[in-house]
Amino acid sequence: MRKMLNTLFITSEDAYLALENENVVIFRGEEKMGQYPLQILENVVSFSYKGASPALMGACAQRNIHVCFLTPNGRFLARVCGQSRGNVLLRKTQYRVSDDTAKSCTVARNMIFGKIFNCRWVLERMLRDHAMRVDAPSLSTASAQLQDQLEGIRQIDDLDALRGIEGMASAAYFGVFDQLILNQKEVFHFDGRNRRPPLDRVNAALSMTYTLLAHDCASALESVGLDAYVGFMHRDRPGRTSLALDLMEELRAPLADRFVLTLINTRVLQQKHFKMQVDGAVWLTDDGRKALLSAWQNRKKEEITHPFLKEKMAWGLVPYVQALLLARYLRGDMDEYPPFLWK
């Protein structure tokens, strides 16, 4: 099993990254704030406008350390990936499948099955653990709707129909998402998914976490030799990691959504960690971003048993394992792609 290394998060807006020997060094002006050996890193995520030196970016690319640049508010800017890895035949197969609507639907259908399955089990867990604190009939109704969609999704062989099912499932799930917020309800409320920009604190936290998860999925896909920009359900768009968005669909609910709910319900995130702009946008403050990133790293270290492989692993390795299973399917080593089904 692959070893999970560290992700270095740079949260200071005026930090500049440079290379010294085999270390990434963080500067603020002329002051050296810290340094970390490249050998312990697998990702660098920077929220600074100042960027990094070409020497550091080259060293990271050479060592397959993925570097991601975001704005301080978490909007994606650019990624440094280095040379493409893996067998060119695998990527050619990926492109052929992507160009074939029926074959694309076969893969995407399993991914969306995983998404709906996992959304349903987030609701079922809440009913099991906190039945007296939620509107149980509403959650039960939404769970039943998701179950109905699961039963019908296997017969779908059209991408537009699949997107329709996915949209209805998301509406049912997010329609009761506010019920999953158990504490700080006077501060955190959810009236529906919104982004670009997020308009409330819950959506601000979700958007930031989805950005981190998308980066992890893109890095995982590239590490096994797949092209993160060529998807099966999310179609080609310049600059969009479409396959990473496909892969993260089944991981949103069990990993990202539950993570954000935990931060709110345990008061790791509070009202003071958010700022409101005059245009209505809501963003994490510097302290809020640091709290979320620290908790995200800890969550990724937590162990689970992979439902398909029946092996224990850290949450942070799940995107890599799913990317590996997808590559095996495309090579013809598996009859179908097995989505991540969490309970």
What are the language-model segments listed below?
Residues 40, 48-121:
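A surface-exposed, charged beta-strand/loop segment in the N-terminal or early-internal portion
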Residues 1-72, 82:
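Terminal-proximal segments
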Residues 1-20, 29, 35, 89-343:
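Active-site helix-to-loop segments that bind/position phosphate- or nucleotide-bearing substrates
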